[in-house]
Amino acid sequence: DVCESVAGRCIHNGCWCERSAPHGNCCNTSGCTARWWCPGTKWD
C-alpha cells in the first residue's frame, strides 16, 4: 500500500522511511518508491 505521512516522514507496516535512509524506502506523495525496501513493505 501507499505510505502514510507522519511528522514529515513516512511509516508503513511499522517501518519508518526517510529519503536519506540508505536501506529504507524513499517516500513521496505517490507512496513508496525506492531501489531498497524496508522488510515487509515491497509488495504492499
Swiss-Prot record:
Q: List the disulfide bonds.
A: 3-15, 10-27, 17-32, 26-38
Question: What keywords tag this UniProt record?
Answer: Bromination, Disulfide bond, Hydroxylation, Ion channel impairing toxin, Neurotoxin, Secreted, Toxin
GO terms assigned for molecular function: ion channel regulator activity; toxin activity
Q: What coarse category fits the chief subcellular location reported for this protein? A: secreted
Q: In which tissues is it expressed?
A: Expressed by the venom duct.
Q: Could you give one GO CC term from the UniProt record?
A: extracellular region
Q: Is Transmembrane a UniProt keyword of this protein?
A: no
Name where it's found. Secreted
Q: Does the keyword Secreted apply?
A: yes
Residue positions, PTM 4-hydroxyproline: 22, 39
6'-bromotryptophan: modified positions = 16, 36-37, 43
What is written about domains in the entry's comments?
The cysteine framework is XII (C-C-C-C-CC-C-C).
Name listed for the protein in its UniProt record: Mu-conotoxin-like Cal 12.1.2f
Give the source species.
Californiconus californicus (California cone)
